[in-house]
């Protein structure tokens, strides 16, 4: 959402964070998990043209008064070059640890610069799969993202995308009925029939409190499991964890029940 704040950061900080990531990924792999790596959708520093005058960029404006990074035009040769370089270097740094890559070109704002979101999605996914033929694009369903137009760009390999219905316990998008939103359709569009995950967000900014939308997710998970054809599972997406254990314990119990939990 933002290109930077404060700094500069010492080189040792990057080295330490990289080693920490490697250790975390090793533990995940031992537990049979695949970490989600960063995907590439064209984000570049706002001064990229000072170093590469050939770069065709779309200015992305600001987010909460902070400068957003610029975005390469995805229909340019520069985008393909940068995307393949990104995935190549990331693999050199972390190794072949995962097939899952998360990126949201228009998270909480952004600017298409007149480009078609459908074309943007096609190019992002094509470059991801060129780097990793088993690649899965992780997309957050949050606010206006992903648009129906962006979801249409997944048609060539829809099974290589996974949408996280980020705040499903409060505002689910998987059953959206507006054809203009989230690939909605009468009866629920399931993101244009893209594999998706029912997620509980619950926590914002690490705030403490014993609260949550318990009835919503108890009934919501059961409803989705019974009615959805493309639900891949459930997950949590909090901004902080190690809090409110009752809520999380109950949430993960819901997937084992056909009718939801009895809250009485």
Where are these regions (language model features)?
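Catalytic-core regions of glycoside hydrolase
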Residues: 1-264
């Amino acid at each position: 959402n933002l290109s930077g704040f404060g700094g500069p950061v010492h080189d040792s900080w990057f080295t330490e964070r990289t080693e920490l990531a490697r250790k975390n990924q090793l533990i995940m792999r031992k537990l049979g998990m695949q970490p989600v790596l960063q995907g590439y959708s064209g984000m570049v520093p706002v001064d990229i043209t000072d170093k590469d005058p050939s770069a065709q960029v779309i200015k992305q404006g600001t987010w909460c008064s902070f400068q957003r990074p610029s975005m390469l035009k995805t229909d340019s040769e520069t985008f393909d070059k940068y995307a393949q370089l990104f995935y190549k270097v990331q693999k050199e740094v972390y190794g072949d640890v995962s097939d899952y890559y998360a990126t949201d070109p228009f998270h909480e704002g952004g600017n298409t610069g007149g480009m078609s979101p459908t074309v943007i999605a096609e190019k992002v996914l094509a470059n991801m799969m060129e780097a990793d033929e088993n690649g899965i694009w992780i997309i957050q369903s949050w606010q206006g993202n992903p648009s129906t137009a962006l979801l249409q760009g997944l048609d060539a390999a829809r099974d290589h995308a996974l949408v996280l219905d980020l705040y499903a316990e409060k505002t689910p998008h998987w059953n959206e009925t507006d054809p203009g939103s989230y690939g909605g359709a009468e009866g629920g569009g399931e993101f244009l029939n893209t594999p998706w995950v029912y997620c509980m967000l619950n926590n914002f900014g690490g705030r403490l409190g014993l609260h949550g939308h318990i009835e919503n997710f108890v009934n919501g998970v059961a409803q989705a499991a019974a009615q959805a054809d493309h639900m891949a599972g459930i997950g949590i997406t909090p901004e902080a964890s190690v809090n409110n254990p009752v809520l999380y314990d109950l949430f993960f119990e819901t997937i084992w029940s056909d009718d939801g939990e009895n809250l009485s």
